[in-house]
Amino acid sequence: MLLAVLALTSCGTGNSLAKAEREAEVSRNVQQSLDNRHYTIAVDWMRPLGGMARHVTSNYELTVNGDEVDSYLPYVGEAYRLPYGGGKGLNFKGKINNYSITYPTSNRSHIEFNVTNNEDSYSFRIDVFNNGKAVIDIIGRDRDAISFDGEMIFKS
């Protein structure tokens, strides 16, 4: 009986160690990606200003590569000025301006930058947690704000 208890206890400890190692590896990958300014966040929820949160079913994502951003995100909300035909919304590539990163807590990184294209000017605020979870807030000059929840993905 004592042997069975010891065996079960040691299995639980092994699983805890493996989980802690995985969490530490994810945290290192997050930090390395942010330090290199090369990361992708896949979104699974959007929260329009004044609207209901909605699950996103397609492969929407935001990618930062150095001084450029590739935004492939859905947009639901009010737009105040649009080009003829409706425009591209939040589907664009652009040059990043005023990129900054701060660490308000030990498990959260806060990123801010601006992007201007021929349709609008956008302010991005991104919170990335050590577990890879992320919240993206986007404020457009000519559009209602929108937020997204997602997770950083690591490509092998």
For the regions a language model picked out, list residue spans one by one.
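C-terminal motif of bacterial Sec signal peptides marking the signal peptidase cleavage site
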Residues: 7-10
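Short, solvent-exposed secondary-structure boundary motifs
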Residues: 47-56, 87-93, 112-119
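Bacterial signal peptide processing site
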Residues: 12-15
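A low-complexity, Ser/Thr/Gly/Pro-enriched, surface-exposed linker/loop concept
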Residues: 78-100
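N-terminal secretory signal peptides
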Residues: 20-83
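Helix-rich interaction surfaces within compact, conserved domain-sized segments
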Residues: 94-156
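Sec-dependent signal peptide recognition
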Residues: 1-2
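A generic structural signal for short beta-strands and their flanking turns/coil linkers
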Residues: 37-39, 58-60, 65-67, 88, ...
